[in-house]
């Protein structure tokens, strides 16, 4: 009997293990994309399992985003009891960085036709929930989320997490509601049901992912899984320099009135930059929108392009 650690599989391509998960079927393309996110990033857990590849609009399917096994099971029971169907199961636990939660949300929102987004776990998670909130906010903004999202983030710093969700998600077409440990999965499932019914039968339309273009002339440094850009010319008009304070690990400093690394680029790349997304969100909403963090998801743009093509073809055929 031989056991291979999930995080060691990538070191042994000779074993032919494509996805280190105990599936009872070959992995779907979206599951392959999700696993590549998890494969080499040891920080926290990201598990994604697609429960329905076909999620037609009006079919009561929702995207499910859990945190921890037991709490996720209770939360799934709660939404199933309201008549919803699960397009997927997802778990981001073990104190993942905001960047991993962001990627999880982007992958969940690559399923056309879902009518809502439901995130709920144990309610007492021992992880910094503001990281989850920032990851969700970044994904929801990029997606211009237009379906309701009910997010239950019970655990450490849940009050701050709920504030982040409800403050920075206000301008989106879809309504976002944040809840904590005192709100039961059943109550939160009821809120999702009410919001979905209020919106009507329209399902989520998956959007293409535009090619990323690096900001010209920006100050930049690599992070563990991405790259951060600062348009220093825009920083001249910044009044607060609040990104310095917002940065949790305190790796930024001011130089000539603009933020730069206070550590070496190598230290940032190896993990001193935790990809918490705090500087980007602060600058976007409170200052000059001069900071952006690019977090690529290999294969997702191509996957979505295929979905969009099928949707457009179906729309054309429906009008013939």
Residue ranges with predicted function:
Residues 146-153:
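Short internal beta-strands
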């Amino acid at each position: 009997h031989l056991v291979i650690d999930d995080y060691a599989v990538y070191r042994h391509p000779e074993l032919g293990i494509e996805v280190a998960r105990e599936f009872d079927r070959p992995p779907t393309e979206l599951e392959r994309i999700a696993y590549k996110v998890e494969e080499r990033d040891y920080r926290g857990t990201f598990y994604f399992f697609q429960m329905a590849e076909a999620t037609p609009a009006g079919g009561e399917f929702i995207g499910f985003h859990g945190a921890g096994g037991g709490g996720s099971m209770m939360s799934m029971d709660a939404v199933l009891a309201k008549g919803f169907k699960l397009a997927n199961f997802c778990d981001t636990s073990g104190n993942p960085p905001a960047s991993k939660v962001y990627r999880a949300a982007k992958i969940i929102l690559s399923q056309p036709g879902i009518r809502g987004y439901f995130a709920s776990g144990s309610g007492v998670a021992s992880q910094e929930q503001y990281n989850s909130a920032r990851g969700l906010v970044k994904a929801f903004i990029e997606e211009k989320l237009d379906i309701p999202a009910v997010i239950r983030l019970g655990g450490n710093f849940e009050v701050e997490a709920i504030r982040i969700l409800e403050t920075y998600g206000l301008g989106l077409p879809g309504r976002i509601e944040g809840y904590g440990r005192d709100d039961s999965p059943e109550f939160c499932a009821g809120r999702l049901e009410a919001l979905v019914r209020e919106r009507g039968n329209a399902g989520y339309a998956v959007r293409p992912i535009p090619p990323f273009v690096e900001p010209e002339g920006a100050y930049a440094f690599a992070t563990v899984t991405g790259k951060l850009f600062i348009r220093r010319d825009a920083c001249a008009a910044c009044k607060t320099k609040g990104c310095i304070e917002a940065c949790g690990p305190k790796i930024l400093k001011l130089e000539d009135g603009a933020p730069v690394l206070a550590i070496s680029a190598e230290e940032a790349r190896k993990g001193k930059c935790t990809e918490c997304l705090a500087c980007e969100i602060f600058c976007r909403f409170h200052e000059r929108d001069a900071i952006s963090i690019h977090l690529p998801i290999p294969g997702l743009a191509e996957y979505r392009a295929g979905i969009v093509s099928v949707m457009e073809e179906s729309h054309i055929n429906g009008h013939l």
